[in-house]
């Protein structure tokens, strides 16, 4: 088994965060009173609205900025954001769906082997930091992709990046390095 052989790794996207604007002022009190599945947080001037399908939670500010979390793909995030904008239109607001952007993607990938974290950190020192007293994972940053990876000794890797493509690229880029530091089975 070598690092160049094609190993199919499953990358499971667990959360996609997106932002969009409505181009109108939103009356949070009206949304709280008339909207469905809402929680009004008056002390921080925002409303949380939950959709069931797709399963998304939106944070709504009166300025018209909305952040959606909980989607499992970029397409699902866009569908959820549009559905949310539509529900605000039904409440009587002049909503225009603009400036949609995926800002963060969280994914998990499991390697088919365990990883020696001390060895991995020594070999990749400028990009990797490992402090076992504080956190059980190595933090590895890839600046060109704007991705951060949390690498655990079990072989589980958590990746945070700006989009799905950069998350997949980060896994492809890190695989040869973690392969070199894998634990050998006796």
Curated annotation (Swiss-Prot):
Transmembrane segments: none annotated. SUPFAM superfamilies: TATA-box binding protein-like. It is found in: Cytoplasm; Nucleus. Signal peptide: none annotated. One of its GO terms (biological process) is DNA-templated transcription initiation. Part of a specialized transcription system that mediates the transcription of most ribosomal proteins through the 5'-TCT-3' motif which is a core promoter element at these genes. Seems to also mediate the transcription of NF1. Does not bind the TATA box. Members of the TBP family are differentially required to regulate transcription and development during early embryogenesis. Particularly regulates genes that have a role in catabolism. This is TATA box-binding protein-like 1. It comes from Xenopus laevis. The lineage of its organism: Eukaryota, Metazoa, Chordata, Craniata, Vertebrata.
């Amino acid at each position: 088994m070598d690092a160049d052989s094609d190993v199919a790794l499953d990358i499971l996207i667990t959360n996609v965060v997106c932002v969009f604007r409505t181009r109108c002022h939103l009356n949070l009190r009206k949304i709280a009173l008339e909207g469905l599945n809402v929680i009004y947080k008056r002390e921080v001037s925002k409303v949380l609205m939950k959709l069931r399908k797709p399963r998304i939670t939106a944070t709504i500010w009166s300025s018209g900025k909305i952040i959606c979390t909980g989607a499992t793909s970029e397409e699902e995030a866009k569908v959820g954001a549009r559905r949310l904008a539509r529900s605000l239109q039904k409440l009587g607001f002049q909503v225009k769906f603009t400036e949609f952007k995926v800002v963060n993607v969280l994914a998990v990938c499991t390697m088919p082997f365990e990883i020696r974290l001390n060895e991995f950190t020594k070999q990749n020192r400028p990009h990797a930091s490992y402090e076992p007293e504080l956190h059980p994972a190595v933090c590895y940053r890839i600046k060109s992709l704007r991705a951060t990876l949390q690498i655990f000794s079990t072989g589980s890797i958590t990746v945070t990046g700006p989009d799905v493509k950069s998350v997949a690229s980060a896994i492809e880029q890190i695989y040869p390095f973690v392969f070199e530091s894998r634990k050998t089975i006796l």
